Structure formats: C-alpha cells, structure tokens
Swiss-Prot record:
Keywords: Carbohydrate metabolism, Glycogen biosynthesis, Glycogen metabolism, Glycosyltransferase, Transferase. GO terms for biological process: glycogen biosynthetic process. It comes from Cupriavidus pinatubonensis (strain JMP 134 / LMG 1197). This is 1,4-alpha-glucan branching enzyme GlgB. Transmembrane segments: none annotated. The lineage of its organism: Bacteria, Pseudomonadati, Pseudomonadota, Betaproteobacteria, Burkholderiales. One of its GO terms (molecular function) is cation binding. Monomer. Belongs to the glycosyl hydrolase 13 family. GlgB subfamily.
Amino acid sequence: MNRVDTRPPERRTQTISDGELGALVEGRHRDPFAILGPHRDGDTLIVRACVPGAHSVMLADSRGEPLAPMTPLHAGGVFTGRLPAGVSVYQLLVRWHNGTQQVSHDPYAFGLLLGELDLHLIAEGRHFELGACLGAQWRNVDGVQGVRFAVWAPNARRVSVIGDFNGWQPARHPMRLRHPSGVWELFIPEAMGARPGCRYKFDLLDPHDAQLPDKADPLALATEAPPATASVVTQPQVSAPPFAWQDDEWMRLRNAVDPYAAPLSIYEVHVGSWLRAANDPARGWEVLADRLIPYVHELGFTHIELLPVTEHPFGGSWGYQPLSLYAPTARLGPPQAFAAFIDRCHRDGIGVILDWVPAHFPTDPHGLARFDGTALYEHEDPREGFHQDWNTLIYNLGRNEVRGFLLAGALHWLEHFHVDGLRVDAVASMLYRDYSRAPDQWVPNRFGGRENLEAVAFLRELNTVVHERCPGALTIAEESTAWPGVTASAASGGLGFDFKWNMGWMHDTLRYLSLDPIHRAWHHQDMTFGTVYAWSEAFVLPLSHDEVVHGKGSMLRKCPGDDWQRFAGLRAYYGFMWAHPGKKLLFMGGELAQWQEWNHDAELDWALLDHPMHRGVHTLVRDLNALYRELPALHELDHSPAGFQWVVGDDHQNSVFAWLRRPAPGSGDVVLAVTNMTPVPRYGYRIGVPSEGCWHERLNTDAACYGGSNLGNGGAVTAEPVPSHGQEASVLLTLPPLATVILQHAGTQA
C-alpha cells in the first residue's frame, strides 16, 4: 500500500495523554490522524486504532494472518501495537464480544485522498464534477476497495462518518480536515462494511464543540426513502456499469436541433400522483416506463417535464423543497432505474426536463440548515437567508462553494442522467432582494438597489456553463416579473435562459376563460395583449400545476356555463393556445378535463376516459400535438413577429379572434386560426386571407369526435378575391360555438 506520510515526526512517538484519549473515544478529537494509524518509531511503526466494542485487536498481514498483538490504551476501545521491523503494510484483525471477527485495512493508514486541484476548484466554486469528488465514492485506493467519504464543513470542530458499517458510532471513524478548504475526508475499506447499499450520515461538532443533529450527505448520490433520512452509498455514476446507455442517436440529434424553430410540447408530470402504483421504491420508475412513456408518445408531446425528483423530505412540497440535490428520490427506485427511465424516453423519441430548485431549501435538521453549526449554505441574516412565504432558507449565492455546489448539481443531471433540460423554479424570488418582503425586511445590494446581484451572476454562469458543457440541453425560467432579458444571452447582459414561462399570458387568458361569455366583450384584450410582448422573450405558454390547486379549480371548472359549454370552452381554449405563438406546456390531467383539482395524494381520474366528453378532450390534445408538429407555421417562427399576424383582433362584440401563422420562407403553408369564445354560432363570417384558393379545415374543436356539435365548414373553403381585413382575399366561414378552427392554405407556401 502506498502512503503519503504527512504526520510531524515529533508527534509520532510521544505519550498520548488521557485527555486526548478521552476526546478520541468521546468523538471530540479534532485531528484523529495525529493519534490513530501508523507512526514511525525508529525502524518500526507503532499503530493505534480506536475500535469501541472490540474484545481484542491484532495487527495482521495482507492475508489476515496475525503479526503482533495490540494492547488496550483506553477502556473506550483504543488499542496500540508495534509492527515487526521492516513491515509497513498491515491489516486490523478485530474480534468482537459475540465471537465474530473482522479483518480490514486501517482507514488511518491511508494518505491524503483529495488532490490539491480538487480542493482549489471547490474553493473557487468551479469543480463541475463535484458529485464525483465529495460525498461517498466507491473507489479503489492503493489496491484496496472501499468508500471514500468527503464533506465540506469548514467550521466544524470534528466530523465523523457514521453508518451501518460502524454501528453509527462517531468515535469509530472521525475524519481528516484538509486546510484551508474545510473539506473532511476518510477512506473506509469494504472489509469494514462500507460498500454500495449501506446507509450513512455525518456526525458533527459545531465551532463550540456542541453536538449537531446527524446530517445527511449534501452530495449523496442516493438516499433512503422518506421518512427515513440517511444517505446511501451507490455505484460511482450511472454512466458506469451496471447501467449502459442506449440513447446515442437521441443525444446526437438533440445537439443539432434549433430549439426555437422546433416544436416543443411539454407534458408536466408529478410522478407520484400520475399513477399511485408508481409509488414503489422497488420498481416505481419501471412502472412509469411501462405506462407513462407510451401514454405521452400516444398523445404526441415532445417532452415530459417532471416536478422535482431530487430527494425531498416532505411529499406535500411536491418536490420543491429538496435536500439531496444529487440524488433522485428513493420513493420510486434507485438512481439506475431513473437513468433507465430517461434512456427509454429517449429511445421512444421523448425528451425529459427536470424542475430544479436552486432558490431555497428546507430547514429540516438533517439537511443543509446550519450544516456545520454556522450559516454555511444560507445567509446568516434572515432578511437575506429566510424565505417568509415558504419557511425555507435561501442559498448564499455570494459564496463560491455554495455556487459551485449548485452549478455542479445542475450538470450532474444533464451529464450523468442525460436529462434534456432544467426548468429553474422561482427565479423571480432569486432576482429581487425585496421579493415578498416588507420595506424593513430586506437588505439592499452594494449599490443600494433591490436587485440580487449575486443571483444574477449565478444564473448567468449557470446558463453559460450548461450551454458550453451540454450542447442541446435547455434551460427554462419560471420568472413571473418583467425582468428584462431573461432569454437574452449572458454575453449581451441577459440571464441566458433558452425559454421563459409566459406567466402574463397564462394569467390573462385564464381570467378571460373564467368569465361568462356575455362579459367577455369587455375583456377582449386579455386574449390579445400577449402578442404585444410575445417576441420580447422566447416564451413557453404554461398551463402548469400551480393553476389547478389551492382552490383555483381544474381547467374544466374554470370554464363557465353548463357541462356542454364547459367542455366546449375548454376545447376552444386549448385550440387557441396551440395555435398561439409560444411553446406549449400542459399539466397532467388537463388532457382528461378533470373535474377535480390536482391532489398530490391521489392519482389522475383515469375512469374519465370511459366518458365520451372527457375522451373527446383527450383526443383533441392528441390531434393538436400532431398538427402542431406537422405544420411548420405553428412552431417555426414562434419567436419572430414574422410568424404571426392578427386578422381579426378587435371583434370584441362577437368575441372572435382570427390570426395567421407563417412558417420560415419556403418551408410550408400559411395557417389561419379562428376562435369563437361565445356559445353563439357565426354563419357567413368573412375573414381576410393572404391568398385565394382552397383552405383546408385541418382541425375543428367542435368536431363530433371531440364531443362537439359537429358544426363546421365541410373540410374546406375557397377564398374569394374579395379584400378584407387588409388582405387581398377572404373566406366566408361558419364559426362553431365556443370553438377554434384551424385552416391550412393548400399549395401556396409562405
């Protein structure tokens, strides 16, 4: 075994005081390597070991054969012995009171574990492989297999690793502090029980020698299923055996796609309540792979967006209060099963986006809160570090190590799990120091302003690093204010996201949808205002989980009128949305037209598919996705004003909207979309179009197959050379009640 010898010579042979021995067995000694392990004494090595509960300990050779006895130094389990001259490689042969024995290499015989470059990058916040550096790493060190534990806790007086392998006794495995990085490290051989599958935590003393709650590993790659809170040793990464990726073709093609010109239709999913049978730590991801992936494929969505799957203690947070930012929740299975789920999505042509939460974290005592007895990950001042709305703590993004922890965590999902994008949660709460705070409850930035400059710098760095290291991966911001340049490049002063949720469009149009049709004439602008700023950012139109909880009502319940009008209004609204500029997002259950709000403790009301009206909405969503993907006009120029033109935007008396969608020049036909948001059919309604000839009725939300009255235009209309609405030609349409009709011009490309 090769060792790096770092102990000062004068420390090796002096007598160990009773006070130091007592501190060692009580788990209070700050420098265990100064006492434990091999220490040179002339031509031989003195070895000390702390093995509480042992009957006896002997020094053994590499085969486990006894070399020399060890005698007790302290009743708490400290033993000492001398190796024969010329012998430096040894093992500890421990006999327990129950008659069993254990032979293992000594954790305190190994030299420094982490390299100086690793520690330097950690301190700079630029170690982008942090998940393979800190935490519990299944490694071979000097020919010995075991687990290398490392944790950042610069202000702790002592850190021990505790777990299944040592009876959860802090005195067994105190760790070495690496100055000045504040990282503690220790290698525990497999022969001592440290191996994949074993549970562990860190036991810490704060700067004043006070005991802290046992802490889960911030860099854990796997965890116990809640309510249990321990971290779990796992294989090094999912990119290594036993999992083999089969999505090379997907990853290659993804990197070549222009996300702004491509269709992007997202099905947002809370996995625990999509199907209750998936809540199985043994095979949850397998169940979802068998059920969710074919379902999404049938409906034609391009991507699945998962509410946070990072491990979180409280299920009622829906994942938005995570503690283990590197571990997929154990509620659904091990990390390899999650990787297999993503791999299968890719092989079926479906991308995967994860909701990711870098804004805040919960106060659970086993988590990041006052991790080493100080405000390590959070701000010390509660005006900066405590979020009053959610009773959570706010990351201190001005600290290099915290920023690096989050950056590496984002890359962990993109690089090691092949995730296709991150939807960053609660960006607005990060950008403003006074977000949801009273005037005297926030701290201005160094210029006296309300902008959180550290958060701005972090988000720019996040997007820059993601786009440099993960070509084709998307970043999407949930940002609810008018912060400028969210999707502008970081180099030009923007934040650098690929897309931003259009919360304004969502709020305006849902408010309009909830009105009785007789009142809609006075709120016409709610449906048109979105196009005033539609190209100021690259937008996703989100009908998310937040809009169907907390008394807001399901999508169907938002619609006024009798049952027929509710279904018709919802179908018309979906048609309006899919034909409107912007990428699409629909939360699960919206395609079923559920009556009830989303309940995270239940599952979707799948029995609704046995009812024709609900099945009709389901079929409509499928057909909208198919048409959206087929027609370039509906997606290619989503983020350019050249792709959109109002034809009828001011008919508030009839609540009719009509607009043209155009593709990139030469790539497809012009599309006309018309929405009638009253229950009154409109016959002979003239609408201007840019070209004469045949306009095919590609989709009518009032079709009988969707549960409608089947009023329409017989599949096609012919444009006449009658100018109207500033266009050279026009069509006379029958507008069904509460319906959207989408027509495609035949033969003349944009």
